[in-house]
Amino acid sequence: MEETEKKVATQEGRFFSKMKVFLMSLTCAYLAKSLSGVYMNSMLTQIERQFGIPTSVVGFITGSFEIGNLLLIVFVSYFGRKLHRPIIIGVGCVVMGLGCFLMASPHFLMGRYKYETTISPTSNLSSNSFLCIENRTQTLKPTQDPTECVKEIKSLMWIYVLIGNTMRGIGETPIMPLGISYIEDFAKSENSPLYIGILEMGKIVGPIIGLLLGSFFARVYVDIGSVNTDDLTITPTDTRWVGAWWIGFLVCAGVNILTSIPFFFFPKTLPKKELQDNVDVTKYEKVEKHRERAKKENLGITKDFLPFMKSLCCNPIYMLFSLTSVLQINGFASTFTFLPKYLEQQYGKSTSEAVFLIGVYSLPPVCLGYLISGFIMKKFKITVKKAAYIAFGLSLSEYFIFLCNYLLTCDNFPVAGLTTSYKGVQHPLYGEKNVLADCNTRCSCLTDTWDPVCGDNGLAYMSACLAGCEKSVGTGTNMVFQNCSCIGSSGNSSAVLGLCKKGPECDNKLQYFLIKSVFSSFIFSLAAIPGYMVLLRCVKSEEKSIGVGLHAFFIRLLAGIPAPVYFGALIDRTCLHWGTLKCGQPGACRMYDINRFRHIYLGLPAAVRGSSFLPAVFILILMRKFHFPGDIHSPDTELAEMKLTEKESECTDVCRSPKVENDGELKTKL
């Protein structure tokens, strides 16, 4: 008897050891994948400037991750549990690491980054061609030499980033469903929620680290170590600045590959914990039979795929909920993807500052909201109908808070000839042909080069030449231009490099915007779990696996992939001045019409999300006609539920993993 107890204790210790190591490994994988995804989103502006591509192409690169997910989601959902799950997870981590490395590779293939400028960074001679000189020919034109134009093909290197991001999507697909199903199958049932909660912590810590990395590397110049940064004439707030985006992807690649190593040493199966608590043979056989029935039911799902699909498509609540989710995610995905760009253009912040502010003000409220929401749902045993009303009310409240962003706006940067007249008067927006004025027509300036300077009159000019400056002193970012005829009639009017900063009133509005973001993020996270509860309860038990997978498929196909593309294309239409490549072709946008940008950035998500409340209202109406588990409390009902407990538990074991595998779909796009 004592030997048996010792044997059981030894087996139990081994089980705990293996399960704990697997849990720790899976948590690290969660952290690595969320770290990579959030870092990617934080570096979109840097990638846009590095390759000189429009925002619509950046949106396509973002959507390529969802494309990679779609390529394997069906295979993983229905056949992944038959294979060696830990090894598949390990391979997925390796693929993610290789994808991140591929995304960083263009930096080593393209050579040094050269931003458009007319200024010689080391010269302080007043005879430099970037100054106002009368009666000269324009020699500083975009290069039309065929050899130089061939070199510009390097801008197509963004395709490497596209393919790498697709690989990241492919590699991430098996981690969540197979990892959670492995825990659900071999961990003690009462410990599963704790283990899943630990995994969620990995998903929370990853984005925080990703945003901190993004904020740090956005401040580091892209060619750090290869150029003398003291000679640069741009700063991190300049729209031509490109941070060291590639270093972060190398970090992500290393982290993902390191996290893959433990998974190759785990067995295909572990002994079920319940069996070690009791060595009774009868119970062992009973559990084994139960497991066999679960496997048969799981295989039946694939055989009954078409009937289940037909049943789901004929389920009005399910289809309306999917429509609501698609509309909501269209708005959220677009807003979050281009939030750093909005903060840069609207409030004059650098990419580094914008990413840091997002991490500080958005993520902590989301984490707190998930914890409080989960506690309330469990503590008060909220029914599915009440959950639907709670989700609707909270979402509507968050929507009205979102609309308040229209009150927290700033004016365009004052740039002579683009947003104001040369006298500083706000005027209907100018075109490129209006950048010339009486004060600079004698200078023979280029009108398409973006090399902004800020005059001491508070007005910015597209270049020192267009400001009428005749002299310069200093080098690098400390260069000062003097005798600028467009700035003032006095001989000592001057200008410095860069756009003029926005006033303190704009900084105050940014603070209000961030405070509002705290409440908005918190309320949204409160609504996510009740909403997801509606999804799980509106379908039959045997349809939950396909139902959750199909719901995720709808979101990726109709929101995750197209939303960044069409949203980016609309943002491109608000550009006031495009950068210029060597062959004279347009590059990345240097300045936007912030008023039109704001209408697109805030108006389109407001319209899309506003329309989502219409199908949500129909869901509430339809739910009154149906009865869901927990809605009716009576002794007869409780007795009937007790008798059906064993039957329902079999279905639950089959469907439990798919319930959780897409738990993040409605929560956040971080």
UniProtKB/Swiss-Prot annotation:
Site entry (Essential for pH-sensitivity of estrone 3-sulfate transport), positions: 107
Membrane topology (UniProt): Multi-pass membrane protein
Extracellular side: 41-59, 112-155, 225-242, 334-353, 406-513, 572-605
Localization (cell): Basolateral cell membrane
Domain Kazal-like: 433-488
Positions of modified residues (Phosphoserine): 634
GO cellular component: a single term: plasma membrane
Positions on the Cytoplasmic side per record topology: 1-20, 81-86, 185-203, 268-311, 378-381, 537-545, 624-670
Catalysed reactions listed for this entry: estrone 3-sulfate(out) + hydrogencarbonate(in) = estrone 3-sulfate(in) + hydrogencarbonate(out); taurocholate(out) + hydrogencarbonate(in) = taurocholate(in) + hydrogencarbonate(out); L-thyroxine(out) = L-thyroxine(in); prostaglandin E2(out) = prostaglandin E2(in)
UniProt keyword annotations, A-Z: Cell membrane, Disulfide bond, Glycoprotein, Ion transport, Membrane, Phosphoprotein, Transmembrane, Transmembrane helix, Transport
Quaternary structure and partners: Binds to PDZK1. Interaction with PDZK1 is required for expression on hepatocyte surface.
Name of the protein: Solute carrier organic anion transporter family member 1A1
Organism: Mus musculus (Mouse)
